[in-house]
Amino acid sequence: MYNDLKNRSTAERAEMLTRRLVGIKSYTRTLGETEKVKEIYSIIKSFPYFQKHPEDVWIQSIAGDPYNRINVWAKLKGRQKKTVLFHSHIDTVETDDFGTLQSLAHDPDALQQYFSTYEGDERVKEQALSGDWLFGRGSLDMQSGAAIHLTNLLELSEQKDSLDGTMLFLFNPDEESEHAGMLAALQELQRMKDEGLKYVAAINNDFIAPMHDQDDTKYIYTGAAGKVLPSFYIYGREAHVGDVLTSIDPTLVASEINRKINQNLDLVEELEGEYVLPPACLYFKEDKHSYNVQTAVSARMYFNYFVFELTAKDVMDKLLSVTRETVEELRIQSERRYDEFRIHHGFPPSNWKWEVAVCTYEDLQNELRNKGLPVDKVLDRVAKEWKGKDRREASFALVEALQQLDPDKKPRVILFFAPPFLPHNYLNEQYEYGTEIREKLVKRLEVVTAESNETFATKRFFPYLADGSYLSLHETEEEVNVLKKNMPRMSDIYPLPIDLIRSVNIPSINIGVYGRDGHKWTERVYKPYTFHVLPGLIKNFALDLVAKKERTQ
């Protein structure tokens, strides 16, 4: 591959590598992820420096991974231990959204030709005709990002002897799902830290996009949003449809809770200048397995909930309050409806009550233990049965098993957290290099603005999901314990290396590729900025971070 790159400009190298990577399918949770990492490994090994120093590029197997996925690392050792980590994920979402054009999803030229005559979206057509945009699955998210890191790896390897600090590169799978690549990478990062590397910062280049149609600002993020997955198991009281008003219908309860939480802007954190999204329902299901005329017994749902400064405890407290309020409103409504129906038909008063408890997973365990019930024995059995299966379904199975253990079969709404959990992080001025990173970023952006006429804005939090969330942890031990106590069998189902994340402690800066329509069939990356401006910005900022004295170029 090096022979195809060596006589080309930086921009040409970046585009050529992007096209090469887009052409290889690497859908999350498929063997294609491993094939792409192997291709990247092969590309790196073709670079002259790594021909002479093969020990500085290596593959890391992801222990216990069902798809046998791997990470690839490359290191350029500098004159001092100060180190910058460049990281990029190589997986993509699948291509079902392309419909009949699925065969073209990995062919940028064919897609550009198609969109050049496309009448369904005038902007897409205009941009295809301009030649400034490269189309294809992963072109934006984020094969172009991996390509730019490869381009910079090549160029930095060509000036390796003059590097003040160490440059470390990671290309990993599984960002779009469970972050297995980055979580495995923590072990390597800790190993190298123990061997003497001193991490200053990490640079991710996950994609950025316009906030609105007139927006051409390029956003730089000095931290990353976190995420929790608050989950609800609703256990009701079944009834024949001929006696429906005496039921406690879990679908009704779930629907009302969903209405109060889903896309509710009142639940959004107020952070000046930051792009903060509301909670979103990702899963909603009642638990009937076949048709009959009995109302459902239980229902389940979970929400994507971004956190910026909030902790898991804050989210739990908020949602408990919303749920209790909703359940009380439903109690009043249901009892009123029952009385109206009874009076309308001339039935005598009854002692029927609509009562639903609201509790956390921790509360439920404590209640059952206080009754002398074998909580741990049941959890051990269910965790063993669900080992290696979907972690969210496993979590629901554990909660359901505890509910079934209750001899009273009390109707309940049980609130808990399911995997994954992404810590939020941000550039902390108290961190050893915090002030230095911010000052050097400002200066570098001033230089690039003068050279390119680009407009930049710095934000505290990358507002979407990113691997960089796992590189540091700001929650206190008490705050983490709320998560641990309310994520069913976290140590078995989702053994998150909390202590390792806290130990590695690398601030992650996102300086992303730029384009439109990530995860859509019209996905495309903007070449003039991404291939011409961004590589130099990232490379020079990294050199700034490890420089022994202030750089003037």
Enumerate the language-model features and the residues they cover.
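Acidic/His- and Gly-rich active-site-bordering loop/insert found
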Residues: 2-137, 158, 162-165
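A glycine-centered beta->alpha junction motif in the catalytic cores
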Residues: 92, 232-239, 307, 512-520
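Short, conserved micro-motifs enriched in small and acidic residues
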Residues: 31, 134-147, 244-251, 528-532
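Short glycine/proline-enriched loop/turn "hinge" motifs that connect secondary-structure elements
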Residues: 160-162, 221-227, 291-297, 405-408, ...
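An extended, acidic, His-containing surface patch that forms the Zn2+-binding/catalytic region
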Residues: 36-37, 55, 339-553
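Midchain, well-structured core segments that form catalytic/ion-binding scaffolds
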Residues: 190-392, 396
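Short glycine/serine- and small hydrophobic-enriched flexible loop segments
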Residues: 150-158, 256-263, 539-543
